[in-house]
Amino acid sequence: MSCNEKNRGVDDRETEQPVFRNSVEAQRIPAIQNGSITAQQLTIDDNLLVDPKLLFIGSKIGEGAHGKVYEGRYRNQIVAIKVLHRGSTPEERAALENRFAREVNMMSRVKHENLVKFIGACKEPLMVIVTELLPGMSLRKYLMNNRKQQLDPRMAINFALDVARAMDCLHANGIIHRDLKPDNLLLTANQRSVKLADFGLAREESVTEMMTAETGTYRWMAPELYSTVTLRQGEKKHYNNKVDVYSFGIVLWELLTNRMPFEGMSNLQAAYAAAFKQERPSIPGDIPPDLAFIVQSCWVEDPNMRPSFSQIIRMLNAYLFTLPTPSPSSPSSPKSDTTETATTSNGAITEFSARARGKFGFLRQLFAAKRAKNSQ
């Protein structure tokens, strides 16, 4: 199953050519993680493989914990080529090959205009994923380059809608991204929209709902991913796709404030503050109450109280409709029609405008029910 798709090609370029072998092993090999066999090795269909003779690798444009990303060329397209680490032991190799196959299979299955387009993969002698190359920068770099001022509200909401639509597509296909953050959101050439990238930590929702807490970057991670004792990597935890909604709430806060979440804290300090002290980034008083409510509904502690991405899309569209038509004389930040706002840092929901109460009544009833239950 796929979502709405909008594809676009790019042009041509050259550099050095790696030697690839176009083959995929058909057998299933046990994948070993944390010293025990957890799953069978996944395989990649031949129709997902690109012709290695047409693939050229150029200069490095990025690097992460699991691999490096290069600019390259495939046929007549400039592409992004992600080369993943193999591992140094048989156990690491099996686990990383399984992760690679999972990422390829998920990326090839979902198509949406706000998801980076998957082109193909190679397995030998390097594990490679080929995607479209977006000429724009990451949302993280874009925000840092404009750190002295907040984004135009309409632009911030449009970016948020792009992300929410991409995530709604993933969730509709039973995929949890688990690493939603500005580094994995890439701007298009005109810097008017963003696309979601990097499925390296994504997982399909399973019947057992047992997944490892190795995921994501702590500053954006949902509290339920943490252990009640420690933050041991690889520990099994019960969670669902609402972990992505929490991360989206942090990203939306960044778009509205253009600040780093949990400023002044290390990643582990931020994780501890969110998980054990129920702290959240403070919401400035100039953030309209309607938007403050959306942010806080996303990062509320109880995952079941968080909205779905389809609900988030409706709320953001409803707010976007209230903004004045852009004009050269319009102020960059629209004024709210209310004086009450939410500025608490612990995720609690405070009073908002009559307009917000009517617009988001279905969610407010959920929060009221939760507060009543907790007070008993």
Regions found by a protein language model. Name each.
Residues 117-125:
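Short beta-strand micro-motifs within the conserved protein kinase catalytic domain, predominantly
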Residues 124-132, 140-141:
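A conserved loop-to-beta-strand element in the N-lobe of protein kinase catalytic cores
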